Amino acid sequence: MGNREIFDQVSDMEKQIGELYEQLGDLKVKLSDLLEENHRLAHENHHLRHHLEEYRQDGDTDSKQPLNETKKKHHTLPGEGYDNLARLYEEGFHICNLEFGSPRRNEDCIFCLDFFDKTK
């Protein structure tokens, strides 16, 4: 095998490695998006189950409570602020105390995700 053939093979391998590296980067971005969506959906599911459980419990106790207390309880939802923060994070903004409100630039923030873990 001549020097030119070896050089061509190394050049081809370098090109293939570059393409694989690019594909790996694309997969990493897709995986990050999927993990973020999975995390958001898990939290949303948790809150919906919690609201459903409260709704079922309220149905049992509504007849025992005065009308004013029932209206107050249904008017303010306990997870409303959390849902707003989750929506802001989903829209691409930081919700952590370090960079609150600044754009995330399509990256996950461990401090923002830590906030979600603390509120479970």
UniProtKB/Swiss-Prot annotation:
Disordered: region residues: 45-80
Compositional bias annotation for Basic and acidic residues: 45-63
InterPro entries the UniProt entry points to: YabA
Subcellular location: Cytoplasm, Nucleoid
Top-level taxon in the UniProt lineage: Bacteria
Cofactor binding note from Swiss-Prot or TrEMBL: Binds 1 zinc ion per subunit.
GO terms for cellular component: nucleoid
Cysteine disulfide links: none
Keywords: Cytoplasm, DNA replication, DNA replication inhibitor, Metal-binding, Zinc
Major place of residence: cytoplasm
Cofactor: Zn(2+)
Binding site for Zn(2+): H94, C96, C109, C112
GO biological process: DNA replication
Keyword Transmembrane tagged: no
Subunit structure: Homotetramer. Interacts with both DnaA and DnaN, acting as a bridge between these two proteins.
Family designation: Belongs to the YabA family.
Summary of the function given for this chain in its UniProt record: Involved in control of chromosome replication initiation. Inhibits the cooperative binding of DnaA to the oriC region, thus negatively regulating initiation of chromosome replication. Inhibits the ability of DnaA-ATP to form a helix on DNA; does not disassemble preformed DnaA-DNA helices. Decreases the residence time of DnaA on the chromosome at its binding sites (oriC, replication forks and promoter-binding sites). Tethers DnaA to the replication machinery via the DNA polymerase beta sliding clamp subunit (dnaN).
Protein name: Replication initiation control protein YabA
